[in-house]
From Swiss-Prot:
Listed cofactors: FAD
One record GO biological process: tricarboxylic acid cycle
Signal sequence segment: none
Name listed for the protein in its UniProt record: Probable malate:quinone oxidoreductase 3
InterPro entries: FAD/NAD-bd_sf, MQO
Lineage, uppermost ranks: Bacteria, Bacillati, Bacillota, Bacilli, Bacillales
Gene for this chain: mqo3
Disulfide pattern: none
Catalysed transformations (reactions): (S)-malate + a quinone = a quinol + oxaloacetate
């Protein structure tokens, strides 16, 4: 690649998304220089950290909100197929990084683990049965098993069935090809790889404090060393903001028009963590249920086996806790400083339209450990207070925006990618399934922000993600070959 193709790129945030974007960009050309800035002292400390999320490899195997019951009673599985395909793209990327020796020991960040859906009550059982009948016809999900038999459920989830009173209608489905992903460990491996690259400069304890676009389209990015308070200005052709909850404030500082009519509502995640090894070893699955009627998708309860630092552990949640910080290590002024003249009507409209979400958040805020334990006992009837501790995990900032389809103050559940008009800046906002589908974000960055350089990056992408540009949904043979290859590269056949 000629010197004329030289680019300076700034990546803000060294979480799973930022390190994934930087890793792919670093491979495209030695003439693309990447300055990467993380405000904390290391990579993957905020939402990507293994203690700050449930570690689900989101592939729509057990998450019921990706399969929607239609008015005629049929099940729409298109979103589930989309999420599954996106996770397969991420698996290809990770697997080829391992295969090429860029990162090592995949068992330190990904483990095979059954994914189970579990519901109670006739309405939910009927839904799960119909979901099973739909998914079993789709190649991506055709290994799914279903049961309404308590003895079978006892084999799948012995801890959850122990001393459970008979008489309640229950059902479960299971897919054995699920995974537990330690996104913190993966992020640190990607960061270590980037630290060795000659065309990457990764600096910790450096905070991006201002962004200004010049008349020539380039960006002036002001960065402050949080230890010395020294400020420097970097000139960038492209800027990617993957700073978790801090992305909205940075987008606002950039001055792009996409910042208007957009805001965020911060919510902390809380989990109950089991402290009794004898209990932990009785459960080996991720079990997702259905959100309570009238509650938002974030309220879906799940019981998660986790593998952290080589040890098996067990989490239940999430519970929510509201507060003004946009980051776990943020400021109590974050929410208030994000309310501007150009988004205040959006925020007010959201407050009016989303009373159930606000009520849920307040209910969660005042919930004690006793209340959390009572909810856990719907999953584990014999759960004892002394075996569990309640802790605060990561922050999520629910994106609030105006849209033609939903009107003013619409709350976005999921990941939102925002591009400037000239595609020189891209920001990732929102929440799950972001980490699992990180490679899809990488591809969107390349396709939108680097469209003129496709000749340079497309061969690299096809090497790292061989199915790029092809459909795993419509090509069963390709899907099965890809799964076999990624399972081998990631050492999942164990």
């Amino acid at each position: 690649m000629s010197e004329a193709n030289h680019k300076n790129i700034v990546v803000v945030g060294a979480g799973i998304i930022g390190t994934s974007v930087a890793t792919m960009l670093s491979k495209v050309s030695p003439n693309w220089h990447i300055d990467m800035f993380e405000r904390l002292e290391g990579a993957g400390i905020e939402s990507s950290n293994e203690n700050n999320n449930a570690g689900t490899g989101h592939a729509a195997l057990c998450e019921l909100n990706y399969t929607v019951e239609q008015d005629d009673g049929s099940i729409d599985a298109s979103k589930a197929q989309e999420i599954n395909e996106q996770f397969e793209l991420s698996r290809q990327f990770w697997g080829n990084l391992v295969k090429n020796g860029d990162i090592s020991n995949p068992e330190e960040f990904i483990q095979p683990l059954p994914h189970i859906s579990f519901v109670m009550g006739p309405t939910n059982v009927n839904f799960l049965r119909k979901r099973y009948e739909t998914l079993r016809t789709l190649p991506m999900f055709d290994t799914i098993e279903y049961t309404e038999d308590m003895e079978t459920m006892r084999k799948w989830m012995p801890l959850m069935m122990e001393n459970r009173e008979p008489g309640h209608q229950m059902a479960a489905s299971k897919i054995d090809e699920g995974t537990d992903v330690n996104y913190g460990a993966l992020t640190r491996k990607l960061a270590h790889y980037l630290e060795q690259k000659s065309n990457v400069s990764l600096k910790y304890n450096h905070d991006v404090v201002d962004l200004t676009q010049r008349e020539d389209g380039k960006w002036e990015v002001v960065v402050e060393n949080r230890e010395t308070k020294e400020k420097v200005t970097k000139i960038a052709d492209k800027v990617f903001i993957g700073a978790g909850g801090h992305s909205i404030p940075l987008l606002q500082k950039s001055g792009v028009k996409q910042r208007e009519h957009l805001g965020g509502f911060p919510i902390s995640g809380q989990f109950l963590r089991c402290t009794n090894p004898d209990i932990i070893k009785q459960h080996a699955a991720k079990v997702y249920s259905k959100e309570p009627q009238g509650k938002p998708p974030m309220t879906v309860p799940h019981l998660d086996t986790r593998y952290i630092n080589g040890k098996q552990t067990l989490l239940f949640g999430p519970y929510a806790n509201i507060g003004p910080k946009f980051l776990k290590f943020g400021s109590n002024l974050d929410l208030f400083e994000s309310i501007k003249p150009y988004n205040i009507t959006t925020m007010l409209a959201s407050a009016v339209k989303n009373v159930p979400l606000i009520k849920y958040s307040i209910d969660q805020m005042i919930k004690t450990k006793e209340g959390c334990m009572n909810y856990l006992r719907t999953f584990i009837p014999d759960a004892k207070d002394e075996d569990w501790e309640l802790y605060t995990a990561g922050k999520r900032v629910q994106v609030i925006k105006d849209s033609e389809q939903h009107g003013k103050g619409f709350v976005v559940f999921g990941t939102e990618v925002v591009n400037s008009d000239d595609n020189s800046m891209i920001a990732l906002l929102g929440e799950s399934p972001g980490a699992s589908t990180s490679l899809s974000v990488v591809l969107e960055v390349l396709e939108k922000n680097f469209a003129d350089d496709k000749e340079a990056w497309e061969p690299v992408v096809k090497e790292m993600v061989p199915t790029y540009g092809r459909s795993l949904i419509n090509d069963e043979k390709l899907m099965r070959e890809t799964r076999r290859e990624t399972s081998k590269n990631l050492h999942l056949n164990r």
